[in-house]
Swiss-Prot record:
It catalyses: (S)-4-amino-5-oxopentanoate = 5-aminolevulinate. The keyword Cytoplasm applies. It comes from Exiguobacterium sibiricum (strain DSM 17290 / CCUG 55495 / CIP 109462 / JCM 13490 / 255-15). GO terms for biological process: protoporphyrinogen IX biosynthetic process. Keywords: Cytoplasm, Isomerase, Porphyrin biosynthesis, Pyridoxal phosphate. It is found in: Cytoplasm. This is Glutamate-1-semialdehyde 2,1-aminomutase 1. GO terms for cellular component: cytoplasm. The gene is hemL1. It is an enzyme of class 5 (isomerase). GO terms for molecular function: glutamate-1-semialdehyde 2,1-aminomutase activity; pyridoxal phosphate binding; transaminase activity. CDD domains: OAT_like (cd00610). Pfam families: Aminotran_3. The keyword Acetylation does not apply.
Length: 432
């Protein structure tokens, strides 16, 4: 595999970007601050499982835009759908057929979505589910799990996980103390802690926000019985269970994590994959709850771009690809091969790691403990990950520049890509 140590055009673009874009990036996670700094790689184009940067280097991509690009870059079925929709106009400001078609397709895949509403992002979707839960229950408090990131609305930037934690600031300036008092945090996979919180505050809690499978301090699965107990305890106190499936929906199975785990929340927030690479969010749930949303009810939510034809067309096309036979079985097969190859490389070179993997998503932690909560992820060696990230990048393997993030496989990755990646891991571990 060729080396990619020289990236003069990326360095030049980063210098220019810092003069006109805050921090030189349009999302903090895109900077390399958490991995030792320097200019991020500027990409020219994506094709299948690969990126090509502005200096002509090719990378095997496991970032997948932090999850949405599950079918690989520039899949022709999706780009054709976007092109066809765009020819008829980019934005109407009126209802149209595609939003109905897509809503039906989501409902067929995720039965808990008795009614659906589209938004422009996962952040908007989560933000609105909380508003609706408050309207439905008449309560104000929200419970979330430490380290789980639910977007950048003020309320959710409390113990917020991968985004702020990557930069070493677990909360955000500008979030008021009054807002912070509306959120109660508790460790993921610790049901007794949650039980105690609800015993004390339950009559004031509107909802609990849950990643059914965590994706924002790495891939962390719930302990047996954890989600079932959350449902039971929450409903005993008259509060609602909201699943944030912005990362998990259509990642591990056709549908959502709730189908995989055989459990049902009251409401669900969606994003990322369902847009096929375009901006999107959606939320839905029980009909009696969703009827509190305007124009039927008092909980207001709107969006000029919400349900736009291009995003609807891209989402439908993406799901058409994912519902084909064997997609998730192949994710699991390649994911298992990648996991085993990394573990064998670590053993060969005496590097201490653990891996959490589910199907085609995994996280490599530089620690000797099994990570089941945010504190475990936090204890993983940041400096070691930063060195590993740079060594992989220099060999043409693109990972997320944060120890908290996952590696995502796409339908475009091949066995050859996995073999090349394992070879790069061996060379990187030999230098750690």
């Amino acid at each position: 595999m060729s080396t990619h140590t020289k990236r003069p055009t990326s360095e030049s673009l980063y210098e220019v970007a810092q003069k006109c874009i805050v921090g030189g990036v349009n999302s903090p996670s895109r900077s390399y601050k958490a991995v030792g700094g320097g200019a991020p790689v500027y990409m020219e184009r994506g094709e299948g499982a690969y990126f090509y940067d502005v200096d002509g280097n090719r990378y095997i991509d496991y970032l997948a835009a932090y999850g949405p690009i599950i079918t690989g870059h520039g899949h022709p079925h999706i780009t054709e759908a976007i092109t066809n929709a765009s020819r008829n106009g980019l934005l109407y400001g009126t209802p149209h057929r595609l939003e109905i078609d897509f809503a039906h397709k989501l409902q067929q895949a995720i039965p808990s979505l008795e009614k659906v509403r589209f938004t422009n992002s996962g952040t908007e979707a989560v933000m609105t589910t909380i508003r609706v839960a408050r309207a439905y229950t008449g309560r104000e408090l929200v419970v979330k799990f430490s380290g789980c990131y639910h977007g950048h609305s003020d309320l959710m930037l409390i113990a917020a996980g991968s985004g702020p934690a990557t930069l070493g600031s677990p909360d955000s300036a500008g979030v008021t103390k009054a807002t912070a008092k509306e959120v109660i945090t508790t460790p993921f996979n610790d049901i007794e802690s949650y039980r105690q919180i609800m015993a004390e505050w339950g009559d004031q809690v509107a909802c609990v926000l849950v990643e059914p499978i965590v994706g924002n301090f790495g891939i962390v699965e719930p302990q047996p019985g954890f989600l079932e107990a959350i449902n039971e305890i929450t409903h005993e106190h008259g509060a609602l269970v909201i699943y944030d499936e912005v990362i998990t929906a259509f990642r591990f199975t056709y549908g959502s994590a709730q189908e995989l785990l055989n459990i049902r929340p009251d409401m669900t927030a969606l994003g990322k994959i369902i847009g096929g690479g375009l901006p999107i969010g959606a939320y839905g749930g029980r009909q009696d709850i969703m009827e509190h949303v305007a124009p039927l009810g008092p909980a207001y939510q709107a969006g000029t771009m919400a349900g736009n034809p291009a995003s609807m067309a891209a989402g439908i096309a993406c799901l058409e690809l994912l519902e084909q036979p064997g997609v998730y079985e192949e994710f699991d097969r390649l994911g298992a091969k990648l996991e085993q190859g990394i573990l064998e490389a670590a053993d060969t070179h005496g590097v201490t790691i653990t891996i959490n993997r589910l199907k085609g998503a995994l996280t490599v932690y530089f620690t000797d403990e099994t990570v089941v909560d945010y504190l475990g992820a936090e204890r993983a060696d940041s400096e070691m990950f930063g060195r590993f990230f740079k060594l992989m990048l220099e060999q043409g393997v693109n990972l997320a520049p944060s120890k908290y993030e996952a590696w995502f496989l796409t339908t475009a990755h091949t066995e050859t890509d996995i073999d090349e990646t394992i070879a790069a891991v061996n060379r990187a571990f030999a230098q750690l």
